């Protein structure tokens, strides 16, 4: 492997698209024709090589991006197969971060679908050069030219058509190569392994000439010398055209468009040629952004085998035979098994044990890997997704990946006490694999709450918990984390006295409670706190050793508010006076007095119920704006801004979390799946009185 494993010979690519556009089938054919797979796996038979989790084979969708390595010509192609369902966009995001190029697969019948728009935007975010493969050209209703128009209209992309289809629907036979100006026809009986070149059919000559002229007009703009040659009527060679297509693809000046039918085994070999010819090698990318740990400086690090080792972990998977597998993309240097490296994000050392090259769920042990490689490491302990592994002597932190906040949550509880411990272990393992899946405990209800990117996402998590960890669980409805606060200043003087023979209990406290936003002299370090305690005792009215008891009592009791039992936040308590007894006073007595003072004093502060407000961002095509804004208003939302972004609109609104349950499904139906949204916690705000009455009644 090392002989040809030079950086310019590597292509790290992703194959991504909308669900059902045919990504996994396309990948299967690539593996078949590059000699990695001896039998073609069909998704609809549940036998695809890349779809190796049970749930994927049952549902016929790809959930985890399986990584695989294959060869074409003298190049090594590392392929990440990505899911197309909207609930799994995190997998796509993780893949795009470590890729150098991508193939976007489109359904020749449906064209640019909603998830295609999402994936395209994600690829824009990471500046991933890409090309387009219009698949399913054999299907009824397939229309290549309509697809090309949709690339312009819906994605705002600049397509560069380099192939045209020969025949349509069931008569689809092959393609016209606009670079060579030849037709390429496949033999059905040879499962697509045999194909031949012939002259362009007479009825397609004019169309081919028209699109060849468009192609040349676009590529010659990238080179003055070739443009002069072209304008003076000289022939532009195929080599010159290929060089300029490569240049334009890498700089995102345009996106080459190819066509075929992966299912019918037509068009896959020219697609592989295009991957090798036009998509970048790690050398073309050249640098990776990061931070030097010793200086804290942000800088660009060269992608090179001779530089110190640096790699980004982009995925973790539990393998039934090897255990936990960490997928890394090596950006610089090389690594051998047995080496010790450092996780610079967590400042922990990791020893490299087994190193594996993955082919879907088959694996091959390797002793060494270097810049440009994507490998799986077995047995890492402290590394999570987005962490950097680095050379110990020259430490760097590569640009971290950003993951969206979960948008849906459910309560889960084990069906039996025997399942309790197993469930905790299962959930923590699944959360380590997937940064968009979170687990927390609701302290008010004691429930375990799981959070994810959509209902299908959580459904599959629960399914995996059952299958892989043998844990049965009951699924409940989630609850909103309400809070309480006071809205005016109040003062309470309370004496706790207990005498029942022997040592008694005595403590007197005088406390002022005030809303934090009304405190004028608030210290900087207290500005982000939910609760502030201060003692202004002068002259020993309450001895110093008893004051921590007052703070502890208030801290404990504020977890149960006075309206509906939700935690009390955003207030300051100031101890201004008190009294003690030489014998009967104690820390405990002052703790009890503080709790009672809270219970008696807080109702005088005009307490109010608070609810979490989320900042919601919806990205939608223009035509759905009215419906989406109307729906957000009906959810007690307040529209903050509306801005154009490319050929879409971005609506930002503040909406109570309680009104956002089920929103993912509403948005899908309002926009036919074309809009997407994300939400993050913004702040707590008062609940309107009529809503507060309903919440109190439920408690």
Curated annotation (Swiss-Prot):
NCBIfam families: EF-G, PRK12740.1-5, small_GTP
UniProt cross-references to PANTHER family, sorted A to Z: RIBOSOME-RELEASING FACTOR 2, MITOCHONDRIAL, TRANSLATION ELONGATION FACTOR G-RELATED
SMART domains xref list: EFG_C, EFG_IV
Subcellular location: Cytoplasm
Entry function: Catalyzes the GTP-dependent ribosomal translocation step during translation elongation. During this step, the ribosome changes from the pre-translocational (PRE) to the post-translocational (POST) state as the newly formed A-site-bound peptidyl-tRNA and P-site-bound deacylated tRNA move to the P and E sites, respectively. Catalyzes the coordinated movement of the two tRNA molecules, the mRNA and conformational changes in the ribosome.
Membership in a protein family: Belongs to the TRAFAC class translation factor GTPase superfamily. Classic translation factor GTPase family. EF-G/EF-2 subfamily.
Record key words, sorted: Cytoplasm, Elongation factor, GTP-binding, Nucleotide-binding, Protein biosynthesis
Family matches, as InterPro entries: EF-G-like_DII (IPR053905), EFG_II (IPR041095), EFG_III (IPR009022), EFG_III/V (IPR035647), EFG_IV (IPR047872), EFG_V (IPR035649), EFG_V-like (IPR000640), G_TR_CS (IPR031157)
Major localization listed first in the record, in broad terms: cytoplasm
Classification via HAMAP family: EF_G_EF_2_B
Domain tr-type G: from-to ranges: 8-283
Protein name: Elongation factor G
Cited SUPFAM superfamilies: EF-G C-terminal domain-like (SSF54980), P-loop containing nucleoside triphosphate hydrolases (SSF52540), Ribosomal protein S5 domain 2-like (SSF54211), Translation proteins (SSF50447)
Gene label: fusA
Record: residues binding GTP: 17-24, 81-85, 135-138
GO cellular component terms, A-Z: cytoplasm
Molecular function, one GO term: GTP binding
GO process annotations (BP): ribosome disassembly
